[in-house]
Structure formats: structure tokens, C-alpha cells
Curated annotation (Swiss-Prot):
Subcellular location: Plastid, Chloroplast thylakoid membrane
Topology relative to the membrane: Single-pass membrane protein
InterPro entries: PSII_PsbI (IPR003686), PSII_PsbI_sf (IPR037271)
UniProt main location, coarse: plastid
Full protein name: Photosystem II reaction center protein I
Family (UniProt): Belongs to the PsbI family.
A Pfam family per the record: PsbI
Keywords, alphabetical: Chloroplast, Membrane, Photosynthesis, Photosystem II, Plastid, Reaction center, Thylakoid, Transmembrane, Transmembrane helix
Organism from which the protein derives: Rhodomonas salina
Keyword Membrane set for record: yes
GO cellular component: chloroplast thylakoid membrane; photosystem II reaction center
Subunit structure: PSII is composed of 1 copy each of membrane proteins PsbA, PsbB, PsbC, PsbD, PsbE, PsbF, PsbH, PsbI, PsbJ, PsbK, PsbL, PsbM, PsbT, PsbX, PsbY, PsbZ, Psb30/Ycf12, at least 3 peripheral proteins of the oxygen-evolving complex and a large number of cofactors. It forms dimeric complexes.
Length: 38
């Protein structure tokens, strides 16, 4: 049961991190004022 909880938490954390990184990257690319990310 403890192992299952660890796996679930790891998966959720990874998913949230990827979603946040993707959202920030897309938001920065849509913003014409951010030329330093190229």
C-alpha cells in the first residue's frame, strides 16, 4: 500500500511538472515581448 502511494505521488508530481513547464513554454512563445527565450 505504501509503495502504491509512492508511485501515485511520483506520477502526479511528474505530470504536474510537465504540464506547468509546457504551459510556461507555450505562454512565453505566445508573448512577443519575450525574445530572450529563443
Amino acid at each position: 500500500m505504501f509503495t502504491l502511494k509512492i508511485v501515485v505521488y511520483t506520477t502526479v508530481t511528474l505530470f504536474v511538472s510537465l504540464f506547468t513547464f509546457g504551459f510556461l513554454s507555450n505562454d512565453a512563445s505566445r508573448n512577443p515581448n519575450r525574445k530572450d527565450l529563443e
